[in-house]
Amino acid sequence: EGVFSDEHGDCPAGTYVRNPPGTSHAPFSTGGCTIFVKLWQFAAGDNESVRLDTTRAAWQPGLVAGLGVLPLHEHGGISTALVRWAPGTRFHAHTHPGGEEILVLEGTLHDEDGDYRAGSWLRNPRYSRHSPWAGEAGALIYVKVGHLGAEWLPLPRD
């Protein structure tokens, strides 16, 4: 919601911004905005900056009918993407050797352990297994896989 801005420009709702360690910016918002932030969650050697308007980007078909995938970033076996689930779409049982984090942005996602509405955050540990499916309205999720157990960059010292 709203518009996030910095000296590089304005980022309307739906923009994915990735600023790796060593970069800097002066963020602000004139009218206010809601943003999702993960600081210092970068694997060693991962230095790519990304600024992507997801509302205009080309989505790809997913691994099952009813899924659309928009890759956001990939490095060393760690992948971040948006995944759009059509209503009632089911994904087969699968395991995440490197763990998985999900932020439900729209709709409802379900699995054997629960029902996750918009705003829900899931952190599934390494080697977790599930069979997710979308609710009646479908779902849009932000998902990151392969990063739990990765070698992280050290936090900066003041």
What are these model-predicted stretches?
Residues H8, P27-S29, L82-V83, H92-H96, ...:
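Short histidine-centered beta-strand/loop micro-motifs
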Residues E1-D6, P87-T89, H96-E112, A118:
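Glycine- and acidic-residue-biased ligand/ion/polar-headgroup-sensing regions
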Residues D10-C11, P21-G45, R126-W152:
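Ligand-binding loop in jelly-roll beta-barrel domains
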Residues S5-S24, H110-H130:
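Short acidic-glycine-tyrosine-enriched beta hairpin
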Residues Y16-R18, V69-P71, T80-R84, E101, ...:
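Conserved hydrophobic/aromatic beta-strand scaffold that supports enzyme active sites
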Residues G77-S79, R84-H92, T108, R117-A118, ...:
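A structural signal for the main folded, soluble domain(s) of proteins
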